[in-house]
């Protein structure tokens, strides 16, 4: 059984091919053209053995990004491991929302930074970024990514729920917090549920807006006048998050769809009356 056939035990042909090409590109430096020219069939015996080990792990359900130890985000390669969420394509759109509405040079706080992909991308675009996370392991990965990509980000261990962090006025708050209700776990793909950190995924069923409420409250005290707040959200709660921001006194609240036409982002401004 070849690699594609092995992958097709779990994935359809299109997904299997995409994973196969990703592995060959990331681990062995082969382009799609190289594959079309058959260079994947001329790997050394050692490389073929490594390829088979990778394919077998992915076929059993382990996310290919964790197997390879990296994922692309906004054109850059970020280190990942099971202590951080795998950066999603849709999250790149939140970075673009920040860039479209907040000028470089302004201060940004990234709440729940994980791999650091949002914070680092914004820092490299010219923003002054501080990023927090409750997990030491996540912060270790984020710091490695910042060092590899030569990005200046201040990383701090902090829990937004338990403390009022930094007596500072920010131009923008950005967060992709846990937003999947615990009751939704049974509907999730096993390769997400079994490998990605539950701390970064789930929020209690009885308080799905927990993190949005806490961050919005923090923003009322620590955003500059006309400062922005940006959230990635569970599409089932986008309108509720928008209403929450309005209730907290934010203005110009907007809900933005992702590339899959799901309501994925909510942003607003703090405007003094």
Protein language model annotation of sequence segments:
Residues 179-211:
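Mobile active-site "lid"/loop adjacent to the S-adenosyl-L-methionine
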Residues 205-269:
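Conserved Class I SAM-dependent methyltransferase catalytic core
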Residues 26-99:
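Conserved AdoMet
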Residues 89-187, 214:
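Conserved SAM/SAH cofactor-binding pocket of Class I
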Residues 1-36, 41:
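Non-catalytic accessory regions of SAM-dependent methyltransferases
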Residues 77, 128, 152-154, 251-254:
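Conserved beta-strand segments of alpha/beta enzyme cores
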Residues 65, 180-183, 236:
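Active-site beta-alpha loop architecture of Rossmann-like, nucleotide-cofactor-dependent enzymes
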Residues 68, 157-158, 257:
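Short loop/edge segments at beta-strand edges and connector loops
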